[in-house]
Every structure is written in structure tokens, then in C-alpha cells.
Swiss-Prot record:
Organism of derivation: Shewanella sp. (strain MR-7)
Subcellular location: Cytoplasm
Protein name (database record): Cytidylate kinase
Family: Belongs to the cytidylate kinase family. Type 1 subfamily.
Annotated keywords: ATP-binding, Cytoplasm, Kinase, Nucleotide-binding, Transferase
Chain residues that bind ATP: 12-20
Principal cellular location given in the protein's record: cytoplasm
Amino acid sequence: MSERAPVVTIDGPSGAGKGTISQLLAKHLGWQLLDSGAIYRVLALAAIHHDVELENEESITLLAAHLDVKFLTGNEKDPVQVILEGEDVTTAIRTQECSNAASKVAAFPRVREALLRRQRAFRAAPGLIADGRDMGTVVFPTASAKLYLTASAEERAQRRYNQLQDKGFDVNIERLLAEIIERDDRDMNRPVAPLVPAEDALVIDTSDKGIDEVLELALNYINQKLSIAN
């Protein structure tokens, strides 16, 4: 791990565009990419596979400490390939069931502590784009630049609906909206590492913005922060 490698954090709720913008930024800058949400999704999937109760913090923490997961370079559709215990779970961790389960296990303080070092180990030259919910507040509090992407719950539900439809999943948009509102409440009100913008983060509402516009705003901000740091 390189303590001196610059880090840009991108936090925000589900469906705000973090994943897309993070991937584009990492590709544009030629930096490493950390999808922290994928780590929690993998942990949730491992718990489901091993019949571990999602409410059992002790068992989930033990599972987190011994999680056999690898992140490999993927393809254009899935830039990061996720391997759990030798099995490709890149698509499996993107289901709504897995997303909801990830939010539950992520609420446990001991689980977050167990995964903290694993996340920080992604920091390496030439730099890191860290995508998550507490990247700028907890994992990388001294990051070079911090972004917080948000959007209305309705817009995020529509995006998630389109994404899952494209992947062949049968989904109901009203149920998706209800689940997003429920997850927002859980993420924003958990006692440890709640979902909030870092005090020094640039907040971007992506509700009525296209990908190119958000990317340009992010790049301009990052370039400004990095030039000041240097």
C-alpha cells in the first residue's frame, strides 16, 4: 500500500451514479478502483451461501475476517470481476436481494472494522478512486478530493429499474422505490459510519444531469484539488 498515493472518494446513496462515475474517473485517470459496496455485497452473498443469519453480528464478523474474495480486471460491461471462493459472482452480487442484505451486514460496527484494513489496502500508485458510503468520512478521511453524489429517490429507483431490466431481472418499480427509501433510512441512521457527506466534499445532485455533465464537474473539481495539493 502506498500512503502517499492520492485518493478521490465518491460517496452517496444507492443509484446516485457513484459506480458509473467512479469507473469513468478511474479509466480517465488510469487509477485503481475500489468498489467498497461490492465487498459488502460479497460478504452478504457469502452469508447467504453459508446459511449465516444476517442478524448475527458475531458470525458475520467472523465470516468477514476470513472472506475469500478476489477482484480481477473484467470487461467493458463489468470492469471488475468479483470472485468469491473461486466462483464468479459479478452478476449475483448485483441483485436487489443482495443489495438489501449488504445494507444489513454493513450496519454492524465489528463487520465494518474487520473490512476497514482490506479497503485501505487498495490505495496504490498512481492513485485510487474509492466508491462507497463512508469513503470520505471514515476509510480515507484525508483524501485529496471528496465527492458526494445524490439524487431523488424516485430517480434512483427508475435508474435501478432500468439497470435490472437490462440484466434480465423481473422487477417492480414501486417495490424498488420502497426498498431504496428503507435502505436510505438504514444507511443514514446507523450508529457507526452513517451515510452523510464529508464536511469538505463537493455535493452533486445528479437527478437532472447526464453522465458527461457529472463527469466534467467531477474532473474539474479533482484537477483543482490535486493542483492545490501539489
